[in-house]
């Protein structure tokens, strides 16, 4: 006696469910956009390791790829990627995947600050170079080892990520296809 069509179908469903729950999660891409003062903005892309996607808070150690591009009035002024990191590069990142939030507003180096190729003084991004900092004084950018005061905004301004890319003016773009 062979299996009935219903039994085969049920077995397929059970196997599919088992595979779905035992198949490891894949890495996830997140998109970043920041609007500063005086026409400064930043877009970026971050990839988290599969093991980090479900964590409450991830750090720079969980990031497998990262790139930011800086703009002034929509014109590219610089960029930085994790591939350019050296032993002297400032690289501090905190991110909450569930809320798509980068914690900001705290002392530099704390759990609520960011340093993407820019330290707390925003003066170590390289020459040529570009970086972003969020601490307790402001959120701002560094260009060619120089703090760009004009870019500064309130340190508590929310910094969110998206699952879709942003345009230069921080409008989420709907992927085609």
Predicted feature locations:
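Absolute protein N-terminus
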Residues: 1, 27-28
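Bacterial N-terminal signal peptides that target proteins for export
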Residues: 1-11
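N-terminal start-of-chain detector that recognizes signal peptides
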Residues: 5, 17, 39-41
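Bacterial N-terminal signal peptides
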Residues: 10-20
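Sec/Tat signal peptide C-region and signal peptidase I cleavage site
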Residues: 21-27
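An extracellular/secretory-lumen and virion-surface interaction module
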Residues: 28-177
């Amino acid at each position: 006696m062979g299996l009935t069509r219903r039994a085969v179908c049920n077995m397929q469903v059970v196997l599919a469910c088992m595979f779905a729950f035992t198949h490891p999660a894949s890495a996830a891409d997140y998109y970043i956009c920041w609007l500063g003062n005086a026409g400064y903005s930043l877009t970026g892309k971050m990839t988290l390791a599969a093991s980090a996607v479900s964590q409450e808070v991830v750090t720079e150690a969980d990031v497998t790829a990262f790139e930011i591009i800086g703009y002034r009035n929509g014109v590219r002024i610089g960029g930085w990627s994790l591939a350019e990191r050296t032993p002297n590069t400032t690289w501090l990142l905190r991110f909450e995947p569930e809320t798509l939030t980068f914690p900001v507003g705290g002392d530099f180096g704390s759990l609520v600050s960011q340093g993407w190729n820019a330290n707390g003084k925003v003066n170590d991004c390289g020459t040529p170079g570009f970086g972003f900092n969020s601490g307790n004084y402001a959120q701002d950018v560094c260009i060619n080892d120089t703090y760009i005061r004009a870019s500064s905004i309130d340190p508590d301004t929310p910094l969110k990520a998206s699952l879709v890319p942003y345009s230069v003016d921080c409008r989420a773009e709907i992927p085609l296809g």
